Every structure is written in structure tokens, then in C-alpha cells.
């Protein structure tokens, strides 16, 4: 494993953010969305923080930076800590209406993990690929960073409603107990989007093992949702972690599963390809993330009128 790259000089990051207009702000954070060339120093720092964060979670590629050939043509959503004057979190967004005409399916990061039959894109229509998420370790115990990043994603979708379907790979670290991983896979198998999953094939499939049958019985017997799954997983894990937070976020939005892949380049993480059609997401979730007026406009309905207290 190679040493982590040095931190990007703070003054360069401040210069980059000064050229951008935030999507929105809270007291502590500002949320920005920009192509790589609009803030040239930010992607490098995001790549450094991804490798730092992934290593801490038992993942990572062992390189100084987690930067790949997809960075130049993706959008970078990032969270800026105003008091800390540093990048606190990030997500990578790939709108397929922009990427597919220019690069075809190989221009999507997900295509390095899964084979997509051409009709998959015809069936699913315009989408927004999500991936490479991170929250800097110092901010991981706060609720706000991940929520603000999801608000940023839904803000983009509300401005580009043709990209109402989100999809991307969510990782389950090899640090999870084998029984925990087996329970997660067995539950997620019950959440497959049958019609579309048949059009996707993993490059390195997850293999059933001697635990699979027992896990399937456990899931069918008493585990009804991903929140219910978190408690037994937390009991199995030495650090008390439950189901991965991003899987829970997808499921709250009505997420469905498309397939599973093992990625040896990133410490054998298990990649779960997931999708969520925000047009079918619970209205309270959309209102919380987009705001009531934006959610109503996105869904093409009048805003709900709440009675005065």
C-alpha cells in the first residue's frame, strides 16, 4: 500500500470554492456542484479523502489518490465546511443523457463492475449514476453531512427531472462478518428488480457459500426490511455497525437491487448495484430533501398545504 498523498493546499481549495455558487448553505456547510474543470483542485482533494476514508473502512485501492479516468467528465457534488475551510464530503454524479452520447456505456463507472445489455438503457431511460461517496472521518458522527449530500442530489434531480432514476454501486466492505454479508445479500436478493436485473451481469459474481441457505431462511422467517436487518448485524459486528447507510438511503427512497459484484481492486468489497425512481419515492422524503415546493413541481402536483398551527 502506497503512502497517502499530501493534503491539497487549503488556499487552492478556497480559491476554487470562491469561483463557485453554492447550491444551498446551512450554518456550518455549503453544498457545491461542479464539473472537474470548474474547480480543478477540488477533485484531487476529494480523491485523497476517498482513499483516506475507504482505507479506514477496510477498502481503498492502496494508491495515494483515488482518482480514475472517469473524473474529468463527471460532476462533483461536494460539501464544504465553512468553519473548517475544508471538504467534508462528496459524491460523484453521472447524468447518462450527457455521458452515453459521448462515451457509450464504457463511459459509466458502473460498467467497470457490471455488463449492461444495450436494452437496459432503453428500458430504464435517462438516469443519474451515483458513486464514490464519502464523508470525511471527522464528520461521520454528524447526521447533517450525508443528509446535505442527498439534498444536493435531489436538488439536481429537481432541476433535471428527466434524470429521476438514480442508480449506482453501493459497497459492502470485506470487514463485515461473513454471516453479516450473507444476511445482507440474502435480504437484498428479495429486493431485486426482476425485469431489469436480467439485463445486467456482474463481471465478478458473488458466489453462494455454505452459509447462504441458513441466511435465506433467516431472512424469509423474520427480516422484513433493512432496518430490521441492522440489529442482528450490529450484534455480529465487533464495532456495532449495522447495514451500510447508503443501502438504507436507497431503500428509504424505494430502492431496488440489480446485481452483486466482487471488486478485487478495492479489497474485495461487495458491490450492490441499486436503483431508485424518485418519482415513486415517499412524498415526505422528497419534501424533506427537495423542499415542499420543489417536490411538488418535480411530481407535477400542487404543494401540500399544511394547516396553520
Give, region by region, the residue ranges found by the protein language model.
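Short Asp/Glu-rich motifs
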Residues: 73, 269-270
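Short amphipathic alpha-helix that is part of the acyltransferase structural core
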Residues: 22-89, 95
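Conserved N-terminal entry element of GNAT/NAT acetyltransferase domains
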Residues: 1-37
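Hydrophobic side chains in beta-strands
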Residues: 33, 79, 93-95, 132, ...
Amino acid at each position: 500500500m502506497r503512502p497517502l498523498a499530501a493534503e491539497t493546499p487549503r488556499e487552492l481549495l478556497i480559491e476554487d470554492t470562491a469561483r463557485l455558487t453554492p447550491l444551498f448553505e446551512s450554518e456550518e456547510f455549503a453544498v457545491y456542484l461542479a464539473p472537474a474543470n470548474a474547480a480543478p483542485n477540488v477533485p484531487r482533494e476529494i480523491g485523497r479523502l476517498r482513499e483516506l476514508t475507504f482505507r479506514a473502512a477496510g477498502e481503498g485501492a492502496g494508491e495515494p489518490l483515488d482518482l480514475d479516468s472517469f473524473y474529468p467528465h463527471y460532476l462533483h457534488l461536494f460539501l464544504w465546511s465553512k468553519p473548517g475551510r475544508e471538504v467534508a464530503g462528496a459524491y460523484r454524479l453521472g447524468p447518462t443523457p450527457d455521458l452515453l452520447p459521448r462515451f457509450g456505456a464504457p463511459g459509466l463507472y458502473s460498467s467497470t463492475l457490471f455488463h449492461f445489455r444495450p436494452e437496459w438503457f432503453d428500458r430504464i431511460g435517462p438516469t443519474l449514476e451515483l458513486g464514490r461517496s464519502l464523508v470525511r472521518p471527522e464528520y461521520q458522527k454528524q447526521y447533517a453531512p450525508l443528509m446535505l449530500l442527498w439534498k444536493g442530489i435531489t436538488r439536481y434531480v429537481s432541476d433535471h427531472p428527466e434524470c429521476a432514476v438514480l442508480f449506482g454501486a453501493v459497497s459492502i466492505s470485506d470487514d463485515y462478518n461473513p454471516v453479516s454479508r450473507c444476511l445482507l445479500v440474502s435480504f437484498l436478493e428479495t429486493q431485486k428488480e426482476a425485469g431489469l436485473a436480467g439485463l445486467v451481469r456482474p463481471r465478478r459474481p458473488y458466489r453462494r457459500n455454505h452459509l447462504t441457505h441458513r441466511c435465506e431462511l433467516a431472512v424469509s422467517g423474520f427480516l422484513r426490511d433493512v432496518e430490521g436487518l441492522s440489529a442482528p448485524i450490529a450484534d455480529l459486528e465487533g464495532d456495532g455497525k449495522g447495514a451500510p447507510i447508503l443501502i438504507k438511503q436507497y431503500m428509504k427512497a424505494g430502492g431496488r437491487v440489480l446485481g452483486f459484484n466482487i471488486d478485487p481492486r478495492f479489497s474485495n468489497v461487495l458491490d450492490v448495484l441499486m436503483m431508485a425512481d424518485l418519482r415513486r419515492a415517499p412524498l415526505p422524503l422528497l419534501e424533506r430533501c427537495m423542499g415542499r415546493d420543489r417536490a411538488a413541481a418535480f411530481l407535477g402536483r400542487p404543494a401540500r398545504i399544511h394547516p396553520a398551527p
